[in-house]
């Protein structure tokens, strides 16, 4: 498969979405064929699943149900949007991918990173990113950012306890150690322009 698949990961409030809105015009202005997308979502079916996953009222959702819904949304998104873009030799910038499931459901929910990884290997047919940027930030800082962002609608995961969000970060740090070949850690607790500059350099090194 051609193209370059780049995923942006991080806990709540790490600045993933903001980063992608900065990266997209930069690469477009460079003449690079590029698309930006997100998980869960990116296409109609997966956006419907996103609505279910984020609905604040669904506090009784069981961990396996949650993991399976994310995997289902991921599969459809991959087949319908990501794979065709890669085949067309495009740069794909994706807000979240498999590592989110490993950190949130595998580690923080206690399903086991290996179990959730195998579930997602089935869903993705081992289609993995060439580069993953992990935006690391303390959960207290990330959640404080969310509280200050009046434009952001609070979702079901935002409402989890601080203990849960600490587990998410712990999970991510374990995943970083496991997949050092493709995951690069970027400090998200710094001005966004610094983050953007650092990430652009990382992506451009892969495009050479």
Swiss-Prot record:
Domain of life where this protein originates: Bacteria
Keyword Cell cycle listed: no
Lineage of origin: Bacteria, Bacillati, Bacillota, Bacilli, Bacillales
Example GO biological process: dTTP biosynthetic process
Gene expressing this chain: tmk
GO molecular function terms listed in the Swiss-Prot or TrEMBL record: ATP binding; dTMP kinase activity
UniProt keyword terms in alphabetical order: ATP-binding, Kinase, Nucleotide biosynthesis, Nucleotide-binding, Transferase
Primary role: Phosphorylation of dTMP to form dTDP in both de novo and salvage pathways of dTTP synthesis.
Catalytic reaction list: dTMP + ATP = dTDP + ADP
Protein name: Thymidylate kinase
Protein family (similarity comment): Belongs to the thymidylate kinase family.
Record EC number: 2.7.4.9
Enzyme class: transferase
Organism of origin: Bacillus cytotoxicus (strain DSM 22905 / CIP 110041 / 391-98 / NVH 391-98)
SS bonds (residue pairs): none
GO cellular component: cytosol
Keyword ATP-binding: yes
Binding annotation for ATP: 10-17
Pfam families, alphabetized: Thymidylate_kin (PF02223)
